[in-house]
Structures are given as structure tokens and as C-alpha cells.
Design a protein with these regions (language model features):
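Beta-propeller folds
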Residues: 2-530, 536-538, 545-546, 555, ...
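Serine-hydrolase catalytic core recognition
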Residues: 362, 499-501, 509-514, 518-862
């Protein structure tokens, strides 16, 4: 009996001639039986040889595949790897990330921006959107310009160059005025300064819409009448280094309150100046060592060894910690229309704050009449914020609006309110409850005279910025995320509550659906989900409204101008794709994937995965090492669709890892009640919960090779996660860079906002102390990195954590850098190389040698 395959139905059937005969004679039956038996044996022998031969061929093929995998390393690389691995030097050179000077509207007609050829250009909407060069690329490159300000008449451009960092947001710099018509440079220096060399100044800006200058030097403010004038008028006289600051913030205010290098605001016509004075005389002092190491002091000019100073000197900083005195602040208005006879007026804080500690969060002029300023104050606990309106001539202030935090929460510091021209109403950002538990940042409209408050934006998404209030057309333009897509950012418009139209009109997203409003430009923005925008100022019917739309990702950045009424594309201003895509194209780049993971109490973590270039959905049995970057700082956001090429991109490309970023409870757009008065609890546990979910659901993640790292607050979270000890089985090792260890020694403004005062929440401070968990960190699993001149998270934190680890006999790796601040800018290549080396050993990552061998083998196979 034979078996064969039916070609049509793919079934086994009996041949038609294999039938059973009955009633034949014995002789005939015997003869026929012998013949059939002989034929059957011959066929069976032939089939067995065929089967054996087929098995040998299959075995050889399988052996070849196994050998290829063993020799080359990864079968997926042979099949799918395109481009070369990114090198760290290529990342740090900065050529892969587009950099551009900021752009701005100078008037309703003129928009200044840096074009693709590097020049500073100006677009004129009144001249058929023509673009002319204001400053050539050559001029900008000669000075290595890092910032600029144009005078309103476009006759001068103020350059900022040769920046030297002081604090995180503040710096000293050289300032140069460029005369546009004469193509001439005018260095900015004070009258008494030497003329032979440029002078480092703390801040320089134009005085309102004039060509007069405001200069801040040694914590005092000076006035210069014109760019060509060499004489100055001193406006303040109280400045003291490290103690009293006029017109610029002290360390705490630039770090966590104003987050800006300046604290002065000039009136529209330049006749009045509003400025803040910060007094740190009662603030405690922090000391840190200063070695003054440089290549010359150690190696000498010819490379020969020279002895460094035997002992380091020390530097000091006024650094307020929780429960200790904070800086006092005063707000002043000075009339500088008569520069020879200055009049000063002190702006008083609200009565509710007079006998309490408080912060100044923002200030500014209202309208163009120089008769009103607005000020936003917040109490020390940061659960009560008051907006004041101060009126000329005595500048007496009245309270116009109060915001109070919900129970078990705090108030986030927001941008300054946007006022109507008459000052009778304004817009502000505030937390608004959506649903039973969740709150989101939305726009409130406050009418001062009628004491009416209306919420203008709604929904389960975050408003991040109010762009412009067009009081002529009664439209408000703002930026916000899209519901269920918090990593995106879009341009929205909503009507204000005008008297002509009392109906409530829902906000409308301009960029969410490119097939709708932006139909004509949908192909230009097809790889854009993260936008910013700049709307032209408009104060009467004579000017047409326009907006410049900036695509910031996930594709390469570009920008174009649109008509605000029809949304028609008018002109492309810059497009980085032609210049940057050829550079990126040669690299094996990771793929970005975003998803949500459920958390307790109905919350959902936002997760972003950078999948390595060799990853494919069909490779279900591949197991990739995992590296998680944590931030965790309350109010921060890590998961975004903005274009980025950072160390995570490099690690995914170079070391074939799945790189993960998380936003858990406490992040912007997430509930903050769960971490109020208990830092280091829920947001730390969420890091474990999310990874357990991902490892269970996605089989391509290697459960045995998971690392974690973070910087600053993220470094603190990393130490706390590893400090869970046996309570977590997810993370094998981690790196804390410039971490916070004990919240009693972090800055008062941030810490008290969430934790309260130590005498009111002592238990919370103890439980949040990372040094208390040091004994639970597994040996050889922790790498601590810190700069000894770190002002954000002082070096004391690293020392305390290291001491706790040592006392607990935990073996760990420790690296410190002399004279380096929080960002470790001067040694960043060494830092990244050290981090990569640690994870290569801990997670058994691809080393450069292994990668080189595989790439050489792949080239040979081609």
C-alpha cells in the first residue's frame, strides 16, 4: 500500500489500484503476492534513502543558521540592521540636533527669525511676506552669538556672546550692539571700565520700545541713553555680591521661582522701570571646595607635570533649606523720565502676606499707559496665590484674584497673567478639576470690576501656555496636549467671554487633525505632533492676524507662517530636514513607541520606548536589555513627542538596548495628591509597577537585564528604587547622577512646596531620606556620580549617601568631579563613557569590540 499527496486538497489518499481481491486460487495468489512483495520492498528502500537524504539537507541548513548566529551574534542584525551605530563623540558634537536662535514678533508686521543659511532675517507681512537679511551668518559666527534682542525700530541688534554660567539660569556675558545700517559693532561696557578689553555683564536689555539700555553689573542697575553714549546713570546703589541683588534674581529665585536670568520689567515707552530687590542677608550659607584645576595647572603648557595647589580653597552660596530663613524680596517702581531726579515707589505685598514669608512669582506692566502694574505673590507654603493690581501715581495695590490649593496639594508656579489692554480683565493658568479626582491646568478668565471668573478651556488635557489674546476678534490662542495623548502638544483657539456672544464656545484644535483646518499644508506637517506657535500682536482692525507654527517633532523641526483667519500657509520660514536628514540617515536609529500602563486608583502611566534598530515585531523570541531613565520630579514631563537625539538615542543605537522613559503619578498631568507630604513613596513604587507590567506583556524585554538611572531628582528615585531591596525584583543595577539624598538639605522653595515644614512633617522627611535605604541596595549594583561644585543638589548629598552605603558595607562605585556643577558640562563625555561602561558590565551589553566584529562580518557577507 502506498501513500501520496493529493495536490489539490493536500490530503493523504490510497491509490485506486490498491484493491483487495477475494476468491483467487492459491497458486495465482502466491505468484501475485511474491511480485507485489518484491516491488513493495524495492519502493520502500528507495523512499527510506530519500527521507534520509532530505533530513541530511535540512540538518545542514539548520547547522548553517546556528553557526551564523553563533559567529555573528544576532540573526536580526543580519536581516534588519541598516546604518552604522552612533558614536558618543558624534552625539556630543551636537550636529545631529538642530540649534536655532529664538524668534519673535517685533510688531504686527515684523517677524525676526534665523533662516536656514544661519542669518538673522526679518519677514515683513506688509510687503508680500518678503524676507530680508538683518544680520549675516558670518557676523553671528564671528561673535559666536548665543542670544539677541532687536530694537523696535530695527536699527540695532543687541548680541549676547561668550556666556559664562553663574547659576543654572543665570550667567555673565559679553554684550555687543550691532548697528544695522553701518555694519558696525559697539561693545557694551560701563563708563568706568577699561576700554582695552570687553566687560562681563550680568544682564543687558533694551528699555521698552526705545534704544536706551538697561545694564546690570555687580547686582546694580544702570541706564544708558543710547548705544553710542558712553556715560551711564546708576539707578540702584544697594547691590552686594552674594547678598543683595537688584534687577536679577538670587540663587533660589533663578533656580525654582522665577527661573529666569532677569527680574526687571520696563514700561512700553521706557519712562518707568519695575524691578525686584532680593536680600539674602538672613539666608544660611553653604560652603563647597574649589580646586581651580585646569589642564595647564596639572600638566603645564608643554605637557610636563606641575604640582597643583596643595589645598583647595572654598566658595560660599546663600542656600535656604527647609525651615530656615528664605530671601526677602521688595518690588520697586522708578520714574526714569527725568534721569537726573529719580523717584522710587515701593510696591507693597497684599495685606494677607504682610507678616508672613512669601515669594514674588511674576510681575509686569499692564497696557501702554504706564498707569498699572500687576504682581503675583505666593505664600511660603505655596498653597495661596494672590494677584495684585497696583495703580499710579502712588502705586497702591489691590487684590484682584486669589487661588487656593486643593486639600493635600500645592499650587504650581505659572506664567504671568495675560491682560486686556484696559487692564479690567485677564487670563491665567490654574488647576481645574475634571471628573471626581483628576485636575488639569486650564485657562481662567477674571473680570476685575465685575468679580467674575470663567473657565474657558476644558477636557482631560493640560494647557501649557497662553500665546496671545486677540481682544479685537475675541480669540485666545494657546498650547495644550491632546486628550489621551499627553506627549503631544497642539495649537488651540477659543473665544473669550465677550459681551457680544454670551454663548459658551468650545475650544478648537488647529493642529490635531491635519486633514481638517490645515488641509492645504497637511503634507508639510505630516510628521508633526508636537507644536509651538507665535501669534502676531494685534490691537486694532487695521492689522491682519498671523501665526508662525513651529513643528518640533517627532520629525525634524520646521516652521511656517499662516493666516490666522483662514489658516492658509503663507511662507515656509525654515526647514531643517534637507540639512539634518542626510546626517541622521547614515545611522541605525531607534524607533519610538508610546503606550499607557494602568496604575492603582485609576491613574495611567505614560511610557515611551526607544526600540533598537534591530528590533522587529516578528522577532518574538529576541530578548533585549532594558535601560530605564527616570525623572519623577513633581510637575515634570519626560514622555514627549518632541524631536530628540540624546544619550538614550545613543545607547539604543550603539548598545542595542530598549531605552524607556516614564511619567508616573506626580508628573505633569498626573494626580499630585498621592505624593503630597510623602516624596519617595508612590512615584518610586510606580517605577517598579510599570516595569513589571512591561516585562510581563512584552516578551522581547529581557527580564534578567534591566537597569535604571536618573539625574537630580531622577538620581534620588534611582537610589530609592534600588533601596527597596528584596521588595523589587525588576532592576538589576542603577546609576544616580547628582542625586538628592536628604530633603532637609535641599532648597526650601521646592521641598516645602511638597513636603511642608520639617517640624510639621518630620515623619515624611525621615521616610523620604534615601540614606535610610542605603543598606538595602544590593552590592555592586550602584554607581554614584556627583560634581563637587553642584549648587542644585549640593555635593553634601552625594557624600551623605556614600557614607551611608559605606557604613552598611555595601560595595558600590563612586565618581566625583572637582569644580563641576549639576550638569557636569566640563566632563560630560567622561561621565557618559563611565555610565556606559557600568551598564555594559552589569547588563552584559554589546561592547565596542563586539559591535566592530559583527559589523566587519556583515560587510564581508555583503
Amino acid at each position: 500500500m502506498h501513500a501520496n499527496v493529493h495536490s489539490d486538497r493536500n490530503e493523504w489518499r490510497l491509490p485506486p489500484d490498491d484493491t483487495l481481491q477475494v476468491g483467487e486460487s492459491k497458486t495465482k495468489k502466491s505468484e501475485v503476492g511474491d511480485e507485489e512483495e518484491l516491488a513493495l520492498h524495492e519502493d520502500e528502500g528507495h523512499n527510506w534513502w530519500s527521507i534520509i537524504f532530505s533530513l541530511l539537507v535540512i540538518g545542514l541548513v539548520i547547522s548553517g543558521i546556528v553557526a551564523a548566529i553563533f559567529i555573528v551574534g544576532y540573526v536580526d542584525e543580519l536581516l534588519y540592521w541598516h546604518g552604522q551605530r552612533m558614536q558618543l563623540e558624534e552625539l556630543l558634537e551636537g550636529d545631529l540636533t538642530p540649534r536655532r536662535l529664538p524668534s519673535s514678533w517685533l510688531s504686527s508686521k515684523h517677524f525676526v527669525f534665523q533662516s536656514d543659511d544661519g542669518s538673522l532675517s526679518i519677514l515683513d507681512t506688509s510687503k508680500n511676506f518678503s524676507v530680508t537679511v538683518l544680520v549675516t551668518n558670518n557676523t553671528l559666527r564671528q561673535l559666536n552669538v548665543k542670544g539677541y534682542q532687536c530694537s523696535k525700530d530695527l536699527s540695532y541688534v543687541l548680541f549676547q556672546h561668550n556666556l559664562k554660567s553663574v547659576f543654572r539660569q543665570s550667567f555673565t556675558a559679553h554684550y555687543t550692539i550691532y548697528d544695522v545700517s553701518k555694519d558696525h559693532h559697539i561693545p557694551v561696557r560701563l563708563e568706568a571700565s577699561p576700554k582695552a578689553q570687553p566687560e562681563r555683564l550680568q544682564y543687558v536689555t533694551w528699555l521698552g520700545d526705545t534704544t536706551s539700555l538697561l545694564i546690570v553689573f555687580n547686582n546694580d542697575i544702570y541706564h544708558r541713553k543710547s548705544p553710542t553714549d558712553e556715560s551711564d546713570t546708576r539707578i540702584t546703589f544697594t547691590g552686594q555680591p552674594d547678598i543683595i541683588y537688584n534687577g536679577i534674581p538670587d540663587w533660589l529665585y533663578q533656580e525654582d521661582i522665577l527661573q529666569s536670568p532677569e527680574a526687571l520689567w520696563s514700561s512700553y515707552d521706557g519712562t518707568h522701570l519695575l524691578y525686584a530687590t532680593f536680600n539674602d542677608s538672613q539666608v544660611g550659607t553653604m560652603n563647597f571646595p574649589w580646586f581651580q584645576f585646569n589642564a595647564g595647572s596639572v600638566l603645564g603648557s608643554a605637557g610636563a607635570y606641575q604640582r597643583a595647589p596643595s589645598f583647595p580653597s572654598s566658595r560660599t552660596l546663600r542656600y535656604p533649606t527647609p525651615g530656615t530663613p528664605i530671601p526677602s524680596v521688595q518690588l520697586w517702581i522708578v520714574d526714569i523720565s527725568n534721569i537726573t531726579s529719580l523717584e522710587y515707589h515701593l510696591v507693597q505685598p497684599p495685606k494677607a502676606l504682610l507678616d508672613l514669608d512669601y515669594y514674588l512669582t511674576s510681575a509686569g506692566w499692564v497696557g501702554h499707559k504706564n498707569t498699572q502694574v500687576s504682581v503675583v505673590w505666593i505664600n511660603r507654603a505655596q498653597n495661596l496665590s494672590i494677584i495684585s493690581a497696583c495703580l499710579a501715581p502712588n502705586w497702591t495695590c489691590i487684590e484682584t484674584h486669589t487661588e487656593r490649593a486643593r486639600d493635600q496639594s500645592w499650587l504650581e508656579i505659572q506664567e504671568h497673567p495675560v491682560f486686556s489692554p484696559d487692564g479690567d480683565s485677564y487670563l491665567l493658568l490654574a488647576a481645574v478639576q475634571e471628573g471626581s479626582r483628576e485636575t488639569y491646568t486650564h485657562i481662567k478668565h477674571v473680570t476685575v470690576t465685575q468679580q467674575r471668573i470663567a473657565v474657558l478651556s476644558h477636557g482631560r488635557h493640560e494647557v501649557s501656555k497662553i500665546l496671545f489674546w486677540d481682544t479685537v476678534s475675541h480669540f485666545i490662542y494657546y498650547l495644550a496636549s491632546e486628550e489621551n495623548r499627553p506627549g503631544q502638544r497642539h495649537l488651540y483657539v477659543v473665544r473669550d467671554p465677550s459681551t457680544d456672544d454670551p454663548r459658551r464656545v468650545e475650544s478648537y484644535c488647529i493642529t490635531c487633525d491635519l486633514g481638517d483646518v490645515l488641509w492645504s499644508s497637511r503634507y508639510l506637517y505630516r510628521n508633526c505632533t508636537h507644536f509651538s506657535a507665535q501669534v502676531s500682536p494685534r490691537f486694532d482692525e487695521s492689522s491682519s492676524p498671523f501665526y508662525v507654527l513651529h513643528c518640533e517633532g517627532p520629525g525634524l523641526p520646521l516652521a511656517a507662517m499662516h493666516n490666522a483667519s483662514s489658516h492658509t500657509l503663507l511662507k515656509i520660514l525654515y526647514d531643517t530636514r534637507p540639512s539634518k536628514w542626510p546626517l541622521l540617515e547614515k545611522y541605525a536609529m531607534p524607533k519610538k513607541k508610546s503606550l499607557e500602563v494602568p496604575l492603582p486608583q485609576g491613574s495611567r502611566a505614560q511610557v515611551q520606548l526607544l526600540l533598537p534598530p534591530s528590533w522587529r515585531e516578528e522577532l518574538r523570541d529576541a530578548a533585549y536589555p532594558v535601560l530605564v531613565e527616570v525623572n519623577g520630579r513633581p510637575g515634570s514631563k519626560s514622555v514627549t513627542e518632541e524631536f530628540q537625539v540624546d544619550w538614550g538615542t545613543y545607547m539604543s543605537s550603539h548598545c542595542d538596548v530598549v531605552y524607556i522613559k516614564l511619567d508616573v503619578r506626580g508628573a505633569r498631568g498626573q494626580t499630585d495628591r498621592s505624593i503630597y507630604h510623602q516624596i519617595g513613596g508612590i512615584e518610586v513604587q510606580d517605577q517598579v509597577t510599570v516595569l513589571e507590567h512591561l516585562l510581563e506583556k512584552h516578551k522581547y524585554l529581557d527580564k534578567t537585564r534591566v537597569g535604571i538611572w536618573g539625574w537630580g531628582y531622577g538620581g534620588y528615585v534611582t537610589a530609592m528604587v534600588l533601596g527597596l531591596g528584596n521588595q523589587q525584583k525588576v532592576y538589576k543595577c542603577g546609576i544616580s547622577v547628582s542625586p538628592i539624598a536628604d530633603w532637609l538639605f535641599y532648597n526650601a522653595a521646592f521641598t516645602e512646596r511638597i513636603m511642608g515644614l520639617p517640624n510639621e512633617n518630620y515623619k515624611g522627611y525621615v521616610e523620604a531620606d534615601a540614606t535610610q535605604r542605603a543598606r538595602n541596595i544590593p552590592k555592586r549594583s550602584f554607581f554614584l556620580i556627583h560634581g563637587m561644585a553642584d549648587l542644585t543638589a549640593p555635593y553634601q548629598h552625594g557624600v551623605m549617601l556614600a557614607s551611608a552605603l559605606t557604613e552598611a558595607r555595601v560595595l558600590y562605585r563612586y565618581q566625583s568631579y572637582a569644580d563641576e556643577g549639576h550638569q557636569l558640562e566640563g566632563v560630560i563625555e567622561h561621565v557618559y563613557n563611565s555610565m556606559q561602561n557600568f551598564f555594559e558590565e552589569c547588563l552584559n551589553l554589546d561592547t565596542d569590540e563586539k559591535a566592530k566584529e559583527r559589523e566587519e562580518k556583515r560587510d564581508e557577507d555583503k
